[in-house]
Amino acid sequence: MSNALYLMLDIKKRLTNIKTCDTLSSTNQYMEVSIMKKVKIGSIIVKILEVFHWVGTVLMAAATVCSMAAPQWVGYFVGFDAKECCGANLTVYGFEVTAPVTNGNADMTTFFLFGIGATVILGLMAMVFRNLSLIFKRSENNTPFQKDNVRMMKEIGIFSIAVPVVGFVMSVIARIVIGAEAAEISINQSGIFMGIIVLCLTQFFAYGTELEKDVDGLL
């Protein structure tokens, strides 16, 4: 009788352990699926932003060229809703230039300088979102601690810092060429801070990559 009781208790304990393991396994699978869905959604959003920025880069480059080839058409389009007293306010990611407006047409020299800076800035931001998209894609079915991901994160930090620097340089050039009223010399500190933070995170990713390499070597 005693042996039968012990046997029943042992069977019950084993069944409980199996049930617990199944529950933990189901929980882990649910968490993995949830993480994968979030990574997939993030990848789609970043890809859309990348495409928008590449389109913006191409359009801005075309408008910059047209400002010299067909200045009257571009000048009317830019100064369509602007007042002569205030000028046309042109801005992108902290880089801001005010183009004088005369008879409804914006000054094309100002727009040309703005277009050069805006094209470079939009191209840099497109590269930021491109790298983010690749990082998401590489991490869908693999660990994020990869050598290529570390390199791309470092590039993101550099591009983020380069955006306000380009805006600052073009603002200085605009003031020299056009005048002090055309552009305000300032630098977008948020872009620099974001770039520095990303570069710091890159060091953690590099350390994680080395640790994962050591673990794989032990296995």
Regions inferred by a protein language model and the residue ranges of each:
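Alpha-helical transmembrane segments of multi-pass integral membrane proteins
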Residues: 151-219
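Lipid-exposed faces of alpha-helical membrane segments in multi-pass integral membrane proteins
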Residues: 52-62, 116, 120-123, 159-169
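Alpha-helical transmembrane segments of integral membrane proteins, especially early/N-terminal helices
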Residues: 71-92, 118-123, 155-158, 214-218
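Membrane-helix boundary/interface segments in integral membrane proteins
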Residues: 131-152
